[in-house]
């Protein structure tokens, strides 16, 4: 059932559902052609990629799932929202839809979650499109470690679940753009309206450090994706991941890099049509098919 708060002018896509590990997952599957799989982070959902879907669906099959705990997907209670849990479910989702030879698009927590599949099965991925994200342990960052430890306790859980700290504070501050209107913000906030629906956002925050071993193991296998054609699109005003770009740039042997100095954490949101155009040009370069 479509929720009453959903703005169909902004998100006009038909959604489908599939059950993964007993959890109902909503996803967009629009267009025909080579497949482009788009994986969101926190506190976002497939709404983040609406501009990419609009800009690519006339020549590509655009698949954009809502990971469990987010968007229009089920949000069961419990702590099974670690990135490694979500990565396992994403692979099950990919298998359920029979996706192969696809372009993988990732952002934020969608980075390690989606790229884990690429690291495990690089032969199934044709290209990578990477927006502001990371794929390594952040334990050595004293500022990050201090903040996450402070947010991992009872007070942090209260902030995330009762006050919507992730979507109403951190996300807003990280995006910081006049194009991010109250009406657009309402689509992110409404998907996490109830305190119980915000639980996954707190688990994600906790696991920035809690999943450090998994993240570091993922980074140690990074050479498995180093030769994939990659497009790196970076908002350089991002307080979280602006500084991560050089590490990504050094990894890939075949990368196109676009830096937007006036953009924050979410280029697909605030530069949506431009992002779609960049992705299309990247995919249409000689020898590149999604």
Question: Could you tell me what each predicted segment is?
Answer:
Residues 28-72:
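Conserved HGGG/HGGXW glycine-rich cap/lid loop of the alpha/beta-hydrolase fold
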Residues 100-139:
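Conserved hydrolase catalytic core segment
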Residues 139-195, 199-203:
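Helix-rich cap/lid subdomain of alpha/beta-hydrolase
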Residues 196-247:
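Conserved serine/cysteine hydrolase catalytic core
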Residues 263-272, 276:
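Catalytic histidine-centered segment of alpha/beta-hydrolase-like enzymes
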């Amino acid at each position: 059932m479509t929720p009453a708060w959903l703005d169909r002018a902004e998100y006009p896509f038909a959604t489908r559902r599939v059950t993964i590990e007993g959890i109902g997952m909503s996803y967009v599957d629009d267009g025909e052609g080579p497949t482009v799989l788009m994986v969101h982070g926190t506190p976002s959902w497939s709404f983040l990629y609406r501009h990419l879907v609009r800009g690519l669906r006339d020549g590509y099959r655009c698949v954009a799932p809502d990971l469990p705990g987010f968007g229009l997907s089920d949000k069961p209670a419990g702590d099974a929202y670690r990135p490694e849990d979500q990565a396992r479910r994403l692979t099950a989702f990919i298998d359920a839809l029979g996706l192969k030879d696809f372009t993988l698009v990732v952002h934020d927590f969608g980075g390690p979650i989606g790229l884990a599949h690429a690291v495990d099965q690089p032969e199934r991925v044709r290209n990578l499109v990477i927006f502001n994200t990371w794929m390594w342990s952040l334990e050595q960052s004293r500022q990050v470690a201090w903040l996450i430890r402070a947010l991992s306790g009872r007070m942090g859980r209260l902030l995330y679940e009762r006050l919507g700290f992730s979507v109403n504070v951190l996300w807003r501050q990280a995006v910081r753009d006049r194009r991010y209107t109250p009406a657009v913000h309402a689509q992110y906030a409404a998907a996490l309206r109830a305190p119980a629906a915000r639980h996954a956002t707190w688990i994600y925050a906790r696991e920035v450090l809690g999943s450090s071993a998994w993240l570091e193991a993922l980074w140690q296998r990074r050479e498995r994706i180093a030769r994939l054609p990659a497009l790196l699109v970076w908002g350089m005003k991002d307080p979280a991941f602006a500084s991560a770009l050089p590490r990504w740039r050094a990894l890939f042997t075949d990368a196109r890099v676009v830096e937007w100095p006036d953009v924050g954490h979410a280029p697909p949101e605030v530069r949506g049509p431009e992002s779609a155009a960049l992705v299309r040009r990247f995919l249409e370069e000689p020898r590149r098919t999604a």
